[in-house]
Amino acid sequence: MLAHPEVVDRIRSEGHTVAYHGFNHDRNSKRSIQEIKRDLLSAPNSLSKRYYRPPYGRLSWWKATAIPSDWKIIMWSWLSYDFDQTLSIDQLVSRAKNSIRPGDILVFHDNNNTKHRLKELLPPILDFIESKGWKAEALD
């Protein structure tokens, strides 16, 4: 976000929510409450809202006390497994068609290990969502 603000601007201009996942992808179970607080307080100002999804989707109730009251924790309800290189695109799409439900919050990963797969994975999943009459939309 800090290195490429133009990418963040484009993401936002295309209707997506820019939220926070942590400056590093450290497991919160290995971090103190103070470290979590410091991380959130250093979050970029370019966020759409103060939404936070903890790395690995894990945050104990005790560590959740580190989250400032003006932040909202947003978890996912459906994990794409796009990072699992043992699963083919066809397997991932089939899994999506059998398990995505209305209202689900889907998680995909945009990193060096998944970016080549997302180009193939997202279109059939988005087509499936549209064929059901559902709508994929931003959180805000």
Residues of each region from the PLM?
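Alpha-helical scaffolding segments of alpha/beta enzyme cores, especially the outer helices
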Residues: 6-13, 38, 42-45, 66, ...
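Acidic-and-aromatic substrate-binding clefts and catalytic sites of carbohydrate-active enzymes
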Residues: 1-4, 26-34, 53-60, 81-87, ...
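A cross-domain feature marking catalytic cores of carbohydrate-active enzymes
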Residues: 20-22, 54-56, 77, 110, ...
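Conserved, mostly hydrophobic/aromatic
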Residues: 18-21, 52, 73, 106, ...
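Active-site beta->alpha N-cap acidic-glycine motif
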Residues: 1-36, 41-42, 48-49, 135
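C-terminal domain-boundary segment and adjacent tail
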Residues: 1-3, 114-140
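His/Asp/Glu-enriched short active-site or ligand-binding loop at hydrolase and phosphoryl-transfer sites
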Residues: 58, 64-97, 134-140
